[in-house]
Amino acid sequence: SILFSDSSFCAQQGYDTATIACLFVPNTYEVYWNISIENLMKRMKKENENFWNAQRTIKADALGLSKEEVCTIASIIDEETANNAEKPMIAGMYINRLNAGMPLQADPTIKFALKDFALKRIYHNMLQFDSPYNTYKNTGLPPGPIKIASVAGIYAVLNRTAHDYLYMCAKE
């Protein structure tokens, strides 16, 4: 993880320290224990290129989003819900907020900014925390994903439910 904080290492991979998590596509990979970091990164780049096929890239472009932006939204959605059936609806809401120029107001980004994913509830005083990941204080997307986005999360963004919703209410 020290390498992922190294801006020159991340730049060699085509990312920065905020977006390096976008390189990784969750899957099961077979690699040998003695693989070099260089060869592992080459493998991850190849897997990433295979994942981001023409169809997925066209869908991202149609939304006006880069691959990194898709992964960033997906990472937030993944932290909002574990229910894959809900993810396209939530994706639609966040994309509506972005298109309206509204702050995302995504609680998972506050958890990330505070470095405490165990938080069950976000309180008003937490919303004042100064961070580029605070989507209550800042409009637009945070600098990068808050975790490695799941394939289901990415799929939800690329196939978001089209609706006019700007808000949601969690049951728990």
Please describe what each predicted stretch is:
Residues 3-172:
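Bacterial extracytoplasmic/cell-wall-associated proteins, especially those involved in peptidoglycan
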